[in-house]
């Protein structure tokens, strides 16, 4: 039978509940337990797919095509377990399900209410499909006190009563701020947050307290007394250098031991922390460093590129080097020469994005990388812009553009109207909905055996995750290849270009998919490992 850990947050948002959940899952895995993590998001969007990156950050895509919260990326990277559609739910999806049931008459004429109908829907989501797991960790998005989170908190309160005794534990993550004028950490925000949580009917078993300095024993005792939590269950969560130090830090503070104790599991299997210690050692003891320019359009919010950032660091882990990131807003190149920005970097990465803003800057970045022989990695939109650059400057198609930007005589990149998903034909219309209408999830690609990318993968058959509505136009393939841009990877039916590369360039690869979504600290994605390796070679030339 699965045991349930419910993780809530208080005082302020962005305390790191997702990292805390992922780290705890990793610690339980290290003891040999099977763990699943689920995220419950209180916003009314059905999913984050149509939300601005500045509002939400990255949209993490799963193998089965779910557009989910970026925390699911942390879950995958820390546990290695691929997430799916059933690991993330939003208030919007819950209400949509309920309204569909009401329209069908499933409620037999009853008045549909938050309690019991909404809370029952949440509970069903939490409980379903957990037969193969020892622990299910549920992170509740938002902060205690938010009106949006109330149905979720009520649902997990009910579960605490309905689950067998000893199979549900509540962890509350809070902040203990340091007040310079007083010269001390303050417990009052945590006390009030716990008071709010208890007023809902949830008594936390464990307090995980964020702080920027050591919490004195006297303050821990104070929190224990006023929050009605055992002193051993008041666990400090101090700031660390990297997120991959968190599992080791939490283990030293006894978080996993306290969770197991709360479940009455004693003695518990000893954890094997060797792989986390190896990752931490490599991060803190690099043998060199490289600088990668990321030419993007959402650089004002780094969370928009969360998986990309982590995948680049994984590439550094694979090569035992530190990866420094130089963030460049693509629009800058539309009014300034790219050379001063890019001459000293060891690699250029152009990530995914949507819309015309910054496109010309990304095209110029691809041109600089091609002409100067600087390693170039184009992902999704970055591959499309590399193809437009080649069409303009190598093939001579001056008007080469993307139909995403408006009507064009030379749509080197165009809207996909249909594609195969398994044996089913998916179709889309230009005037259709935005939400859930892209090519989403894992798709197969076939690589040319003699291509550079096939050598990197060590295979000619790959499965990678996609999130795009536009695609390089196959009608331009022959002319682009004649100019030197090799279409090294295609969809199995030969219709959709998946990867491009230059044979006469040290490392210039564009991919239509998002390899960053499948990279792990213990298993760096081969493309990122190879890209950083090429950057190391470039660093010897600069």
From Swiss-Prot:
Binding site for L-glutamine: 54, 353, 381-384, 404, 469
Domain Glutamine amidotransferase type-1 residue range list: 291-541
Highest rank taxon of the organism: Bacteria
Residues binding CTP: 13, 146-148, 186-191, 222
Annotated positions binding UTP: 13, 186-191, 222
Regulation (activators, inhibitors): Allosterically activated by GTP, when glutamine is the substrate; GTP has no effect on the reaction when ammonia is the substrate. The allosteric effector GTP functions by stabilizing the protein conformation that binds the tetrahedral intermediate(s) formed during glutamine hydrolysis. Inhibited by the product CTP, via allosteric rather than competitive inhibition.
Record GO cellular component, one term: cytosol
Gene3D superfamilies the record matches: 3.40.50.880, P-loop containing nucleotide triphosphate hydrolases
GO BP annotation list: 'de novo' CTP biosynthetic process; pyrimidine nucleobase biosynthetic process
GO molecular function: ATP binding; CTP synthase activity; glutaminase activity; identical protein binding; metal ion binding
The keyword Ligase is annotated on this UniProt entry: yes
Keywords of the record: ATP-binding, Glutamine amidotransferase, Ligase, Magnesium, Metal-binding, Nucleotide-binding, Pyrimidine biosynthesis
Catalytic activity field: UTP + L-glutamine + ATP + H2O = CTP + L-glutamate + ADP + phosphate + 2 H(+); L-glutamine + H2O = L-glutamate + NH4(+); UTP + NH4(+) + ATP = CTP + ADP + phosphate + 2 H(+)
Chain positions recorded as ATP binding sites: 14-19, 71
InterPro entries hit by this protein: Class_I_gatase-like, CTP_synthase, CTP_synthase_N, GATASE, GATase1_CTP_Synthase, P-loop_NTPase
Entry-linked NCBIfam families: PRK05380.1, PyrG
Subunit structure: Homotetramer.
Function: Catalyzes the ATP-dependent amination of UTP to CTP with either L-glutamine or ammonia as the source of nitrogen. Regulates intracellular CTP levels through interactions with the four ribonucleotide triphosphates.
Other observations noted: CTPSs have evolved a hybrid strategy for distinguishing between UTP and CTP. The overlapping regions of the product feedback inhibitory and substrate sites recognize a common feature in both compounds, the triphosphate moiety. To differentiate isosteric substrate and product pyrimidine rings, an additional pocket far from the expected kinase/ligase catalytic site, specifically recognizes the cytosine and ribose portions of the product inhibitor.
Annotated protein name in UniProt: CTP synthase
Recorded name of the encoding gene: pyrG
């Amino acid at each position: 039978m699965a045991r349930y850990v419910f993780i809530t947050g208080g005082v302020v948002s962005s305390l790191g509940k997702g990292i805390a959940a992922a780290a705890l899952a990793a610690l339980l895995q290290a003891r040999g337990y099977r763990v699943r993590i689920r995220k419950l998001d209180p916003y009314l969007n059905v999913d984050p797919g149509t939300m601005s990156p500045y509002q939400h950050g990255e949209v993490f895509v799963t193998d089965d095509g779910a557009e989910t919260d970026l925390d699911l990326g942390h879950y995958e990277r820390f546990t290695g377990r691929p997430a799916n559609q059933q690991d993330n739910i939003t208030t919007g999806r819950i209400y949509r399900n309920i309204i569909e049931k009401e329209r069908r008459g499933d409620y037999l004429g009853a008045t549909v209410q938050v309690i019991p109908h909404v809370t029952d829907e949440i509970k069903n989501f939490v409980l379903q499909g957990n037969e193969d797991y020892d622990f299910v960790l549920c992170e509740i998005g938002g902060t205690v006190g938010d009106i949006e989170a109330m149905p979720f908190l009520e649902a997990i309160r009910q579960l605490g009563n309905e689950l067998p005794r000893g199979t549900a534990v509540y962890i509350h993550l809070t902040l203990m701020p340091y007040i310079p004028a007083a010269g001390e950490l303050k417990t009052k925000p945590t006390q009030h947050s716990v008071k709010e949580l208890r007023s809902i009917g949830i008594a936390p078993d464990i307090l995980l307290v964020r702080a920027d300095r050591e919490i004195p024993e006297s303050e821990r005792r104070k929190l224990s007394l006023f929050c009605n939590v055992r002193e051993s269950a008041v666990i400090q969560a101090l700031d660390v250098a990297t997120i991959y130090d968190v599992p080791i830090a939490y283990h030293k503070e006894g978080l996993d031991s306290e969770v197991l104790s709360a479940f009455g599991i004693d003695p518990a299997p000893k954890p094997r922390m060797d792989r986390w210690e190896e990752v931490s050692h490599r991060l803190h003891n690099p043998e060199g460093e490289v600088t990668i320019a990321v030419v993007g359009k959402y650089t004002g919010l780094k969370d928009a590129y969360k998986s990309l950032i982590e995948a680049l660091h994984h590439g550094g882990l694979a090569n035992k080097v530190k990866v420094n990131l130089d963030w460049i807003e693509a629009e800058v190149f539309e009014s300034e020469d790219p050379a001063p920005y890019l001459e000293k970097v060891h690699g250029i990465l152009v990530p995914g994005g949507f819309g015309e803003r910054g496109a010309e800057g990304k095209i110029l970045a691809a041109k600089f990388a091609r002409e100067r022989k600087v390693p170039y990695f184009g992902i999704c939109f970055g591959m499309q812009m590399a193809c437009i650059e080649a069409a303009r400057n190598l093939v001579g198609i001056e008007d080469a553009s993307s139909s995403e930007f408006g009507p064009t005589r030379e749509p080197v990149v165009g809207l996909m109207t249909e594609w195969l998903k398994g044996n089913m034909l998916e179709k889309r219309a230009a005037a259709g909905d935005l939400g859930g209408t892209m090519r989403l999830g894992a798709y197969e690609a076939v690589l040319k055996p003699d291509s550079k990318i096939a050598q990197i993968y060590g295979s000619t058959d790959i499965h990678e995750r996609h999130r795009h509505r536009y695609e390089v136009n196959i009608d331009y393939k022959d002319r682009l290849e004649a100019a030197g841009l090799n279409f090294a990877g295609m969809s199995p039916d030969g219709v959709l270009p998946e990867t491009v590369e230059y044979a006469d360039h040290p490392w210039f690869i564009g991919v239509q998919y998002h390899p960053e979504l499948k990279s792990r600290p213990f298993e760096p994605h081969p493309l990122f490992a190879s890209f950083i390796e090429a950057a190391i070679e470039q660093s010897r030339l600069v």
